């Protein structure tokens, strides 16, 4: 069973909260869920929607087509009616609204929809869109949201303005009744979200007053399997990973989609802190600093790392661009700092609230000069949690910056994660070569066989840090022999990491290893491809790259042997993964499936693309799934 549910309305009206309540309630009934939220880069007024896929099996992707659409305004109907295939719940009050009256809709999109409705012989109104949907066998459910909100206000004896947002509860209640699940799961989800008795009572009344509007359509039954699962998004997964992994300093400058991670850490600051020397634990607080800009954020994190605490920062494309100078300083001074890089659409401000995979080559080679950095890329929420810990361990073990890549899709999507996938029993801190103190002979940058020097913390020994080239003590030096040796010392750490980190841990492989087709991907497209691999008849080996620096060149090269087609699937124009594969292995990728319109890969569009590539032999397929790009 697989069911697609979408809720949409004006930004700032509680769409995200309503979707999370609904998702929580469905997950509590034992179902797996994958959800993604899309929103405009303004605070209020633009169209916001949340897509959920519900399944009795593990699910990792959404589709273009929608089984149930819950809409509260005219724009949601216009934006999504074409993709609804079963049920459309709409606000009866907006039936006569003309598309030209929807001021928040982008004019290009409005023109496409008007043109489509006109050619199909319908009015360019909500009514016309609904008639088109009805003709295509969609069941329409009109709802008088204002009437129910007024009824609740009268029962609670509060102003109507207070009950305005119960309309969202009405929409998800009708949806829940259509699924046929026990309403008590929904009540529990509401009460776990709202803590004030007024709002709990108000929303419970909204459930009671709207539950009987429809009859059950899908008759889902609660799962009998008792399993511990988490329901969380990517930002939260990374934040929890950092907390669990022992981060003690987090700096940031607000930027979408990175800020939510730091906000979560700030709200959960009280932790047990472990002394890096003695191992003793005591209660403490994570320091979270909202800096004045990204330059300050990276330099604060570097300073904190020098004192011996696990330190990190989080940012996105424009912010990372500002951090590059600080990143180079950290590379020169072998500072174990972690940067969580949330990738969004660029260049410049670009698409602040939309996804991309265009920042892949950039972080690997960011900074002038050459210095080692480790670059990780998470593919799902469990990996995001574990990689946050892995990044902290790698940074301290190899005394080098670590960049953790998380796309906006992963950051702002939600999923149910089985408890065992987090592998908590396997997670531990690795702090590398730490010395308690140093005497007058201590050399912070001492030449060693593996390039990694014993690390003392500020205040524990005499040491010098500078952006200039330096000798073993840290004093500035332009001596040619020292320059060669110190340069090699730094770069050797990446070579050592390449030898010590098993290549098998830097990739994941799914499917039949003997398939004639190899798909190489990274990040969130992995989940879409895994769903296709498990539930469709496509024949391919799926290779997910989890670490780009050091690159797992030997394993990737071996997996490329004897294939008819080697295909990259990624969210950028240049097929950057194929460029890296060529650079590190000397072998060519034969085909690419690409997308850069700011929206995530959707399962149905990717299945169509695979047919074009695997069966028809197309070399390059560009996807454009989103709103009304599939209109004929």
From Swiss-Prot:
Short sequence motif named YPITP motif, residue ranges: 253-257
Binding residues annotated for substrate, in chain numbering: 256, 344
Compartments where located: Cytoplasm
Function: Catalyzes the coenzyme A-dependent oxidative decarboxylation of different 2-oxoacids such as 2-oxoglutarate, pyruvate and 2-oxobutyrate to form their CoA derivatives.
Protein name: 2-oxoacid:ferredoxin oxidoreductase subunit alpha
Biological process per Gene Ontology, one example term: response to oxidative stress
Domain of life: Archaea
UniProt signal peptide: none
Annotated site, Plays a key role in the broad substrate specificity, chain positions: 353
Native source species: Sulfolobus sp
Upper taxonomic lineage: Archaea, Thermoproteota, Thermoprotei, Sulfolobales, Sulfolobaceae
UniProt note: domains: The Tyr-Pro-Ile-Thr-Pro (YPITP) motif is important for the turnover of the reaction, presumably through its flexibility and mobility.
Keyword terms, alphabetized: Cytoplasm, Oxidoreductase, Pyruvate
Record note on quaternary structure: Heterodimer composed of an alpha and a beta subunit.
Activity response to pH changes: Optimum pH is 8.5.
GO molecular function terms attached to this record: 2-oxobutyrate synthase activity; 2-oxoglutarate synthase activity; pyruvate synthase activity
């Amino acid at each position: 069973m697989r069911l697609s549910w979408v809720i949409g309305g004006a930004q700032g009206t509680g769409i995200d909260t309503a979707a999370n309540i609904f998702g929580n309630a469905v997950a509590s009934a034992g179902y797996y869920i994958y959800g993604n939220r899309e929103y405009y880069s303004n605070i209020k007024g633009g169209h916001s929607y949340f897509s959920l896929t519900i399944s009795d099996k593990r699910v990792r992707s959404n589709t273009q087509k929608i089984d149930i659409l819950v809409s509260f305004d005219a724009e949601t109907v216009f934006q999504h009616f074409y993709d609804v295939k079963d049920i459309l719940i709409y606000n009866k009050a907006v039936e006569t609204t003309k598309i030209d009256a929807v001021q928040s809709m982008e004019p290009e999109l409005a023109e496409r929809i008007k043109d489509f409705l006109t050619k199909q012989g319908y009015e360019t109104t909500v009514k016309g869109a609904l008639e088109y949907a009805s003709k295509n066998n969609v069941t329409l459910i009109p709802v008088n949201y204002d009437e129910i909100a007024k009824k609740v206000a009268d029962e609670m004896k509060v102003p109507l303005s207070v009950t305005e947002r119960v309309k969202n509860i009405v929409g998800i209640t009708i949806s829940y009744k259509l699924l046929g699940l026990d309403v008590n799961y929904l009540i529990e989800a509401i009460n776990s979200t709202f803590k004030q008795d007024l709002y709990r009572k108000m929303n419970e009344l909204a459930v009671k007053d709207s539950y009987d509007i429809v009859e059950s359509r899908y008759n889902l039954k609660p799962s009998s399997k008792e399993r511990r699962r988490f329901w969380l998004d990517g930002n939260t997964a990374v934040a929890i990973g950092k907390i669990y992994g022992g981060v003690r300093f987090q700096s940031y400058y607000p930027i979408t989609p990175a800020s939510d991670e730091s906000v979560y850490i700030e709200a959960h600051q009280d932790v047990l802190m472990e002394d890096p020397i003695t191992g003793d634990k005591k209660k403490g607080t994570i320091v979270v600093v909202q800096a004045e800009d990204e330059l300050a954020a990276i330099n604060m994190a570097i300073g904190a790392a020098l004192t011996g605490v696990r330190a990190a920062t989080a940012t996105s494309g424009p912010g990372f661009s500002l951090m590059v100078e600080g990143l180079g300083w950290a590379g020169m001074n072998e500072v174990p700092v972690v940067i969580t890089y949330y990738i969004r659409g660029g260049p410049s401000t670009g698409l602040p609230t939309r996804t991309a995979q265009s920042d892949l080559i950039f972080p690997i080679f960011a900074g002038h000069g050459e210095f080692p950095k480790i670059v990780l890329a998470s593919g799902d929420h469990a990996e995001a949690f574990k990689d946050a810990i892995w990044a902290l361990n790698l940074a301290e073990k190899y005394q080098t910056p670590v960049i953790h890549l998380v796309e906006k899709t992963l950051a702002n999507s939600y999923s149910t994660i089985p408890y065992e996938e987090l592998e908590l029993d396997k997670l531990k801190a690795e702090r590398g070569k730490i010395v308690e103190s140093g005497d007058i002979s201590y050399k912070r940058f001492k030449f060693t066989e593996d390039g990694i020097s014993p690390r003392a913390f500020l205040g524990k020994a005499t040491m010098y840090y500078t952006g200039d080239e330096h000798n073993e003590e840290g004093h500035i030096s332009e001596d040619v022999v020292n320059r060669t040796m110190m340069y090699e010392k730094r770069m050797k750490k990446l070579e050592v990491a390449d030898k010590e980190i098993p290549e098998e841990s830097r990739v994941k492989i799914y499917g039949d290893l003997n398939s004639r087709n190899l798909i190489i991907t990274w990040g969130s497209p992995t989940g879409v491809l895994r769903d296709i691999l498990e539930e469709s008849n496509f024949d391919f080996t799926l290779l997910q790259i989890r670490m780009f620096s050091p690159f797992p060149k030997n394993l990737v090269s071996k997996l490329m042997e004897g294939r008819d087609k080697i295909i990259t699937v990624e969210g950028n124009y240049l097929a950057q993964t194929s460029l890296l594969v060529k650079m590190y292995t000397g072998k060519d990728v034969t085909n690419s499936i690409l997308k850069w319109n700011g929206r995530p890969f959707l399962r149905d569009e990717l299945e169509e693309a695979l047919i074009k590539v695997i069966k028809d032999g197309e070399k390059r397929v560009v996807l454009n799934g989103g709103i009304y790009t599939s209109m004929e």
